[in-house]
Regions:
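Accessory alpha/beta interaction modules
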Residues: 1-67, 77
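Short, charged alpha-helical interaction segments and adjacent helix-coil junctions
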Residues: 1, 75, 81-158
């Protein structure tokens, strides 16, 4: 079900970003990011980057501008940057004690402010009600240029 959810999110984003009469070349690159506390593929990787490819010729470049990144908060395989490890640890255990960098401290202040603001909390609950209940916290982030995803504080990773 997860790959089909990804497909749905990409389609929904693309449909909203291509005005009638525009060429397909004007579609922006889109990265859908899932941050999960469970391993979506069972390989214990912190980062799984998914892109479309040609099955018969895997080395063929197929740049459709769509990319999906799964971030598993407890993964240990691969070589993710230390800042990403700290961010994912904070995402799962969001407390002031786990805000170990300046960027995470800024993020924690924003999270605290949002939690205190009743209107924002109500809007969040209504959006969750409309979307349904998911096991994983999901974030969709549009990226205009390149193949990057953005972590707290605007730090870009390849």
């Amino acid at each position: 079900a997860l790959p089909r959810r990804v497909r749905f999110y990409h389609a929904k984003i693309d449909a909203g970003n291509l005005p009638s009469g525009e060429t397909y070349g004007s579609l922006r690159n889109v990265v859908v990011i899932f941050i999960t506390t469970y391993d979506p593929f069972g390989l214990n990787r912190m980062v799984y980057t998914i892109k479309n490819c040609c099955v018969e010729v895997p080395e063929l470049k197929y740049e459709d501008g769509a990319q999906t990144i799964f971030l598993y908060t407890r993964g240990s395989e691969g070589n993710p940057p230390e800042e990403l490890k700290q961010l994912l640890h904070y995402m799962e255990h969001s407390s002031v004690e786990n805000a170990s960098t300046e960027n995470l401290k800024k993020l924690h202040r924003m999270v605290t402010a949002v939690k205190r603001d009743g209107e924002v909390g109500l809007a969040y609950m209504n959006s969750r009600k409309n979307e349904g209940s998911y096991k994983a916290w999901t974030q969709i982030r549009k990226v205009r240029e390149g193949n990057y995803f953005i972590a707290a504080g605007g730090t870009a990773y390849r």
